[in-house]
Amino acid sequence: MRKGIHPEYRPVVFRDRAADYAFLTRSTMTSERTVEWEDGRTYPVVDVEVSHVSHPFYTGTARVLDTAGRVERFERRYGKQDGA
């Protein structure tokens, strides 16, 4: 591996703002902001809007929303077909 061309891979805290949850992992992300972690060390912190803690797919709260009856409108327009 060539020296000097790769970003630094280091511990970083990712903070999920929606779920008020933070986790420490390794990444090449950088940040001006820092946070003191449970082990007493200071790490860069990256705020994220969605993580595995708050995403509906991972939490099991996913819902299918039929906004404005689009499925019914489609079926009226093109007819509901039986089959596969």
Swiss-Prot record:
Keywords (A to Z) from UniProt: Ribonucleoprotein, Ribosomal protein
GO biological process: translation
Keyword check for Lipoprotein: no
Origin superkingdom: Bacteria
Database matches in Pfam families: Ribosomal_L31
InterPro entries on file: Ribosomal_bL28/bL31-like_sf, Ribosomal_bL31, Ribosomal_bL31_B, Ribosomal_bL31_sf
Keyword Ribonucleoprotein: yes
A GO CC term attached to the entry: ribosome
A GO MF label: structural constituent of ribosome
Family: Belongs to the bacterial ribosomal protein bL31 family. Type B subfamily.
Subunit-structure text: Part of the 50S ribosomal subunit.
Name of the protein in question: Large ribosomal subunit protein bL31B-2
